[in-house]
Amino acid sequence: MKENDVVLKTVTKIVVFILLTFGFYLFLAGHNNPGGGFIGGLVFSSAFLLMFLAFDVKQVLVALPLDFRILMICGSLLSFLTAVVPMFFGKPFLYQTDAYVQLPLLGEVHLTTVTVFEAGIVLAVVGVVVTVMLSISGGRS
């Protein structure tokens, strides 16, 4: 790939922003509408992979100092803990609880443990997909 491919790099910056925004929307809409942690994680992963294709892998990893293997482990652990912790309070595995919280700028917000579980899924999916793709491509995993 040419080092001075201005069009590709410019379009990539715009498309990555759109992909990250859409992935965040899919993540948040997932417990009430189609979407969720898995598909949101895949869209986030596609944004990272597009950056790796348009820019040098090493350059992107320097700009985003993320260890995707650690991200995968943290996501799996977060989802596992969200599923197991209710058992310590006499509730069944994967018990869901929710609450309405008054936040200063947002007003009343509905919070659920499903959102925390789905956040773990997002982190795990991004970690797995990017690690596998970097391993296949020969980049640092």
From Swiss-Prot:
Subcellular location as annotated: Cell membrane
Membrane topology annotation: Multi-pass membrane protein
UniProt KW Transmembrane helix keyword: yes
GO CC annotations, alphabetized: plasma membrane
Domain of life, per lineage: Bacteria
Gene Ontology biological process: monoatomic ion transport
Parts of the chain that traverse the membrane: 10-30, 35-55, 70-90, 116-136
Alphabetized Pfam families for the sequence: MnhB (PF04039)
InterPro entries: CPA3_antiporter_subunitB, MnhB
Keyword flag Ion transport: yes
Family affiliation: Belongs to the CPA3 antiporters (TC 2.A.63) subunit B family.
Oligomeric form and interacting partners: May form a heterooligomeric complex that consists of seven subunits: mnhA2, mnhB2, mnhC2, mnhD2, mnhE2, mnhF2 and mnhG2.
Name used for this protein in its record: Putative antiporter subunit mnhB2
Organism per entry: Staphylococcus saprophyticus subsp. saprophyticus (strain ATCC 15305 / DSM 20229 / NCIMB 8711 / NCTC 7292 / S-41)
